[in-house]
Regions:
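Phosphate-coordination loops involved in phosphoryl transfer and adenosine-cofactor binding
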Residues: 4-6
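Active-site and donor-binding regions of nucleotide-sugar-utilizing enzymes
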Residues: 8-148
Length: 148
């Protein structure tokens, strides 16, 4: 297996709430390992905290079926680019923040390539989409919860 780099962590926060949550964690991670480069998808808060953005979170922030359909080609292109760049870069870790419909497929491919995966904000499985638990098991090494 290829060696992982120790100098980058890839973040993917594609919503305003994810940008906020990640901005509460990213500075602590960066302070604990000053040599780490933080890069990926984030919003203004994460960028202010040192994220080198590949894409801005606003490019993924869509609501309603029609808006999703209209922006779907761009969203899928961003997803493919995140997978490609992450696997090629071999970062120390990939951290997906919420947005499970976007992140879980990326996380599954990234983890299969041997890169450790953390997912912040556990996706709902109890109320609906209970089958999602199987994808989470395949995709994620560590799942961070915001509620007990």
């Amino acid at each position: 297996m290829e060696q992982l780099t120790n100098n980058s962590i890839i973040w993917a926060a594609g919503e305003n709430s994810g940008d906020y949550l990640a901005s509460r964690v990213l500075p602590a991670v960066a302070a604990s390992r000053p040599n780490l480069k933080m890069e990926g998808i984030g919003g203004n808060r994460m960028i202010q905290d040192g994220l080198d953005p590949w894409f801005h979170a606003s490019e993924l922030s869509v609501r309603g079926y029609l808006e999703v359909i209209r922006h779907l080609p761009r969203i899928l292109k961003i997803r493919r680019e995140m997978m490609r760049r992450t696997v090629q870069l071999r970062p120390a870790a990939y951290i997906g923040v919420d947005a499970p419909d976007f992140n879980l497929s990326i996380e599954e491919k990234v983890r299969a390539s041997g890169i450790p995966v953390v997912h912040m904000v556990a996706p709902a499985v109890w109320a609906w989409r209970p089958q999602r638990i199987h994808q989470i098991k395949r995709a994620v090494d560590h799942l961070l919860l915001i509620f007990p």
